[in-house]
């Protein structure tokens, strides 16, 4: 596979950034650190250019590491901007398009927009958009844009860009030998003022006792398939009600399961409501979970993907196990 490189910045994207006076910046619903870091860094950068920005998110801000930023975001497009759409552009970050922004989608539909993203399942072809699937995070692409136009990032921008990069790389655990340029980018962020020690503490500290109890339940329900190559588990709405937490620290769960000898892929199903589940897939090296997620209407990356789907834990798990057959039976 080719090395990760600095993406070419389309002139149409540059023209889009210069064209409008006000920008609406939105990411996917259920945001993570890359989504939030990309949004805030882009906002800071555009304000440097003399633009006005409005940060938007449908939420919810369930992840502890992003909750400090919730107050910066609005769930609605200001009414005043709806009356002058010719002055306003929308930038959709870390997702394939407006339809992934949840309840914001209808509000954003009337504004001209571009997409900046790194998900492998993103098929956006709109003029001015920049999708680079090899990028380790959307913040990597945002950093490329800022450095292309301004030469360097500010301390505040560096902190948010570093936060997003660390989120999607598992604090660099998921990077491989193609990633030399990523570490060069990282060095520039640290030189600009990003603090790795502080960022790690912010991302991994402050977890509740209940979140660890919920992790223990997920681990206790693990079931192996395909000779242990696939591990499947789940959590229920009753779990969260009994324990009193909404977030189980997903990254820690996947990290613990990936440490089991022979594991190539993981599937964790969360019963969100009586009728719908959210599903997370993770893999090591060869298994492409983005294609599996896409087959159920979801998306993501080769080694990390997910979806929100109608169904129950009991009805969905057999379907997900079967979906891995072509890849894991071939790997036998």
Model features per residue range: what roles?
Residues 2-30, 37-67, 83-88, 167-295, ...:
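Hydrophobic helix-and-loop "lid/oligomerization" segment in the mid-to-C-terminal part
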Residues 33-37, 134-137, 157, 249:
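A generic structural signal for residues located within well-ordered alpha-helices
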Residues 41-43, 107-110, 131-132:
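Glycine-rich, phosphate-binding/catalytic loops in enzymes
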Residues 70, 74-128:
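Active-site cofactor/cluster-binding pocket
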């Amino acid at each position: 596979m080719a090395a990760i490189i600095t993406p070419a910045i389309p002139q149409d994207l540059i023209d889009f950034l210069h064209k409008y006076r006000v920008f609406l910046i939105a990411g996917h619903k259920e945001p993570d650190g890359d989504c939030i870091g990309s949004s805030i860094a882009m906002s800071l950068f555009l304000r440097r250019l003399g633009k006005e920005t409005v940060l938007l998110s449908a939420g919810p801000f369930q992840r502890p590491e992003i909750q400090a930023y919730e107050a910066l975001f609005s769930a609605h497009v200001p009414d005043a901007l709806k009356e002058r759409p010719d002055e306003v552009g929308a930038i959709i970050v870390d997702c394939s398009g407006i339809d992934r922004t949840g309840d914001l989608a209808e509000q954003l539909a009337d504004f001209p927009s571009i997409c900046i993203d790194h998900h492998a399942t993103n098929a956006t072809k709109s003029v001015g958009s920049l999708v680079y699937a090899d990028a380790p995070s959307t913040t990597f692409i945002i950093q490329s844009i800022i450095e292309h136009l301004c030469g360097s990032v500010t301390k505040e921008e560096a902190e948010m860009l570093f936060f997003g990069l660390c989120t999607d790389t598992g604090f660099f655990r998921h990077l491989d030998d193609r990633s030399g340029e990523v570490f060069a980018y990282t060095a520039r962020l640290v030189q600009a003022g990003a603090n790795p020690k502080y960022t790690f503490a912010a991302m991994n500290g402050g977890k509740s006792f209940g979140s660890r109890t919920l992790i223990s339940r997920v681990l206790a329900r693990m079931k192996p398939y395909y000779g242990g190559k696939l591990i499947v588990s789940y959590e229920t709405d009753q779990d969260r009600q009994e324990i009193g937490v909404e977030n189980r620290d997903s990254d820690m769960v996947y990290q613990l399961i990936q440490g089991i000898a022979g594991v190539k892929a993981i599937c964790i199903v969360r019963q969100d409501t009586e009728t719908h589940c959210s599903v997370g897939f993770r893999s090591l090296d060869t298994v492409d979970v983005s294609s599996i997620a896409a087959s159920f209407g979801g998306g993501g990356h080769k080694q990390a993907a997910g979806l929100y789907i109608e169904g129950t834990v009991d009805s969905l798990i057999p379907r997900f196990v079967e979906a891995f057959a072509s890849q894991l039976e071939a790997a036998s």
